[in-house]
């Protein structure tokens, strides 16, 4: 079935400029099925295979086609209305649905359909876009945004006001990825397909894009687009080539030690679903 979906999407995407004129019912049903599979976590925009993250470009294309062929509709909430092409994930959920999926979502948490939230996750007032994947026992804290197709691992804490970049606008080749057991400090921004590898700690106010220098002060090495596993990262700067000014960078200062782990330890009480 997946291969059939993939073939339909690849063929349709090549002629996406003409899709609005006459939408093939098969394509429409295929897109709906793909969004539902994303919503349930059955498929993902990116997967780690043999230690390497692989982006399923056809799934990303499916989301773009969705925006192309579906019209805006009125989405009615108890206190506010919306006008969009994509429904909210919890729109038709009742008490039993939340208990079954073991998700805690507080008021003003906006989660678009087509994103997946694993069990024992806590969603504070925040925004999670279509195609995103949130692993088990993770927290998305207040006023954070998880961009389209971003991948968040297990036991991850995304602190208040954090921005995790999406891939749909501006169009990016690969999604931003936060691997398992990471902590992202308040008001930090991780964008443009950057990968934060497992066990890393990003301090408050760190801004990392694809072209941001990531200076490993332990090994005197420069990285781009990737935070090596088990790194503690703080904001900093490095001198320009002409030494006339400094350029923003991220600095790896150490590996997480006992004190670091104590400070960022997740509170299991907050993830109880009873």
Curated annotation (Swiss-Prot):
Record's keyword annotation contains Cell inner membrane: no
Keywords annotated in UniProt: Acyltransferase, Amino-acid biosynthesis, Cytoplasm, Diaminopimelate biosynthesis, Lysine biosynthesis, Repeat, Transferase
Catalytic activity annotation: (S)-2,3,4,5-tetrahydrodipicolinate + succinyl-CoA + H2O = (S)-2-succinylamino-6-oxoheptanedioate + CoA
SUBUNIT field: Homotrimer.
Name by which UniProt lists this protein: 2,3,4,5-tetrahydropyridine-2,6-dicarboxylate N-succinyltransferase
GO biological process: diaminopimelate biosynthetic process; lysine biosynthetic process via diaminopimelate
Pfam families listed in its UniProt record: Hexapep, Hexapep_2, THDPS_N_2
Organism: Wigglesworthia glossinidia brevipalpis
């Amino acid at each position: 079935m997946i291969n059939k979906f993939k073939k339909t999407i690849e063929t349709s995407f090549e002629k996406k400029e003409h899709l609005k004129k006459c939408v093939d019912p098969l394509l429409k049903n295929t897109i709906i099925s793909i969004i539902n599979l994303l919503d349930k976590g059955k498929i993902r925009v990116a997967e780690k295979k043999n230690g390497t993250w692989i982006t399923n470009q056809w799934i990303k294309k499916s989301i773009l086609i969705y925006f192309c062929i579906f019209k805006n509709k009125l989405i009615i909430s108890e206190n506010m209305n919306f006008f969009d092409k994509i429904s909210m994930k919890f729109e038709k959920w009742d008490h039993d649905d939340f208990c079954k999926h073991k998700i805690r979502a507080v008021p003003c948490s906006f989660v678009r359909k087509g994103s997946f939230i694993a069990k024992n996750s806590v969603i504070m007032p925040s925004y999670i876009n279509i195609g995103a994947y949130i692993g088990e026992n993770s927290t998305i804290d207040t006023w954070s945004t998880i961009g389209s197709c971003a991948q968040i691992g297990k036991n991850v804490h995304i602190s208040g006001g954090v921005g995790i970049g999406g891939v749909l606008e501006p169009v990016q080749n690969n999604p931003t990825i936060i691997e398992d057991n990471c902590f992202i400090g308040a008001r930090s921004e991780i964008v443009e397909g950057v990968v934060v590898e497992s066990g890393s700690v990003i301090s408050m106010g760190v801004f990392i894009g694809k072209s941001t220098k990531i200076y490993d002060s332990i090994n005197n090495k420069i990285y781009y687009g990737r935070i090596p596993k088990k790194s503690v990262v703080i904001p900093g700067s490095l001198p320009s080539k002409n030494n006339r000014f400094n350029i923003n960078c991220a600095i790896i200062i150490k590996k997480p030690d006992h004190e670091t782990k104590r400070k960022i330890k997740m509170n299991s009480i907050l993830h109880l679903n009873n």
